[in-house]
Swiss-Prot record:
Enzyme class: transferase
CDD domains: NAT_SF
Keywords: Acyltransferase, Transferase
EC numbers on record: 2.3.1.178
Protein name: L-2,4-diaminobutyric acid acetyltransferase
Gene that this polypeptide is encoded by: ectA
PANTHER family referenced in this protein's UniProt entry, alphabetically: N-ACETYLTRANSFERASE (PTHR43072), UPF0039 PROTEIN C11D3.02C (PTHR43072:SF23)
Taxonomic path: Bacteria, Bacillati, Bacillota, Bacilli, Bacillales
Record bears the keyword Acyltransferase: yes
S-S pairs: none
A biological process from GO: ectoine biosynthetic process
């Protein structure tokens, strides 16, 4: 099966290039542990987001995700310090989808493949045994996330379809871009 990133028609569209050249990843530090979050990790997730360009949610959101969605969230720690996370959930109406809400990686770990390792950990969990698609929304300017999900499609030798999800006019104010849905799959032929 060929890896494809298919663009669907949408206002202000752009072309996704599935052949993006990326530098080889730096070595991931072997002192990093990857696992399920606890409620105590919620504050550290929020702090990591606050130091980045990610959309900031309330601290409550991160604590709640750790409490009620620990099976579909992943944290990475270096010497007990949180250096990365994924928050995700399986939509009740689409049990074959894992929706990735947010991925955060500390600046000390960027470019080392940590985000990919976090996604692989998530997909390999028992709770995702019936998951055949990974979905996420990504803004047009977020090239790093676009490349991450395109890489995931290549790793699974599957498709990456891109379509409009939420147009910019749905967001209050003038500073939020449209959100595009990236749908990777099927993961299992």
């Amino acid at each position: 099966m060929q890896v494809q990133c298919n663009e669907k028609a949408f206002k202000g569209g752009f072309i996704i290039n599935s052949q993006i050249a990326t530098a080889p990843p730096k070595t991931l530090d072997t002192t990093i542990t990857i696992g399920k979050p606890t409620v105590e990790d919620g504050a550290a997730m929020w702090e990591l987001v606050n130091k980045s360009t990610l959309d900031t949610n309330s601290p409550y959101k991160y604590i709640m995700m750790c409490e009620y969605f620990a099976e579909t969230c992943v944290v990475a720690k270096e010497n007990e310090r949180l250096v990365g996370f994924v928050t995700a959930f399986i939509p009740p109406e689409h049990q074959d989808v894992i929706f990735v809400w947010q991925i955060g990686v500390d600046s000390s770990q960027r470019g080392k493949g940590l985000a990919s390792k976090l996604l692989q950990e998530l997909i390999s969990r028992d709770i995702c045994s019936n998951v055949n698609y990974v979905e996420a929304t990504v803004t047009p300017s977020n090239k790093a996330s676009q490349a991450l999900f395109q890489k995931l499609a290549r790793e699974y030798n599957t498709q990456c379809e891109v379509s409009e999800c939420f147009s910019e006019d749905l967001f209050p104010g003038d500073d939020h871009e449209a959100e595009l849905t990236f749908r990777i799959g099927p993961l299992h032929p």
